Amino acid sequence: MIFLSHFSNLGDPVLLMAFLAFVLILVSLPFSFWSLSSNSNSSLVRLLIGVANLVLAFQLCTRWFLSGHFPVSNLYESLCFLTWTSTLVQLIIERRYLNPIIPAILTPFSLLTISFASFALPGELQIAGPLVPALRSSWLVMHVSVIMCSYSALLLGSLLSLAVLILSNSNELQIRGSSLGIGAYRTSNSTKSGYVNSRSLQQLFSNEENLDNLSYQTITVGFLLLTLGLVSGAVWANEAWGSWWSWDPKETWALISWLVYAAYLHARITRGWQGRKPAMIATFGFLIIVICYIGVNLLGVGLHSYGWFLS
């Protein structure tokens, strides 16, 4: 079995550090849920995620040193890089808004990505190999790192939007302030009895409002990075293959992702949408990014594939 075979490869320092990061994130997960249930912030969770982030940074640097190239040449390396950027984005978000709901939402995503890299991929895909000629370019660091950072920001921002949908629970919620400000929610629905606990309602709306604002800001950063990544990728493609755009499956899905999040930002900035409506668009964008990043890779098609099933 693929899962069991990986424990015999822990003599590799790169794989060992990835496993250590997995353990740290795994241990932090129940504490994240406990903090959420008790409505208390856990410094232990932030410490564990911070240490995992440092371990992954050291792991990537070690792979870079051993392989001689930027560590994003296959699906394993890119998943480790995605986990590193995701934990970093989580720590940055928690500095802006310290609330137990943040790690409870975002930690499972980092655990999923590092678990997939460590246990789901075959051993031969975890080994660093030589770069293909097209990747031997200074654009590798610029383009791929920016794209991966954009994926992290967009995916985590979309998860925050999903949390808004879950917390609002089908109520029509609106924010009286702007997307960048801190306003107050109002609901079009009332309870059947006409009585609402003001303390719990204020706390719920405050969480939703802050999550909505954080999602908007995080997705905005991710969208700008994705735009920069697409432009740099087009320049690199022209140098490598003589064409700015070849409608490769990865390029096509990246463009679809860009259009979805452009629609999200347009709805918020131009139409003034806030709360559930843009959150639905962002949640749909999450699925598109997953298809763009994982789906295309695992099918093993196109110039950008780090495929496994069919390669």
From Swiss-Prot:
Q: Is Membrane there in the keyword field?
A: yes
Q: Which UniProt keywords apply?
A: Cytochrome c-type biogenesis, Membrane, Thylakoid, Transmembrane, Transmembrane helix
| A Gene Ontology molecular function term of the record | heme binding
Q: Per the UniProt record, which residue ranges are transmembrane?
A: 14-34, 47-67, 70-92, 101-121, 146-166, 218-238, 252-269, 281-301
Annotated membrane topology: Multi-pass membrane protein
Which GO annotations describe the biological process of this protein? cytochrome complex assembly
GO CC term (a single one): plasma membrane-derived thylakoid membrane
Report the domain of life of the source organism: Bacteria
Presence of the UniProt keyword Electron transport in the record: no
Q: Where in the cell is it found?
A: Cellular thylakoid membrane
> Subunit structure, per the record?
May interact with ccs1.
* Functional description taken from the UniProt entry: Required during biogenesis of c-type cytochromes (cytochrome c6 and cytochrome f) at the step of heme attachment.
Per the similarity annotation, which family is this?
Belongs to the CcmF/CycK/Ccl1/NrfE/CcsA family.
Q: What is this protein called?
A: Cytochrome c biogenesis protein CcsA
Gene (name only)? ccsA
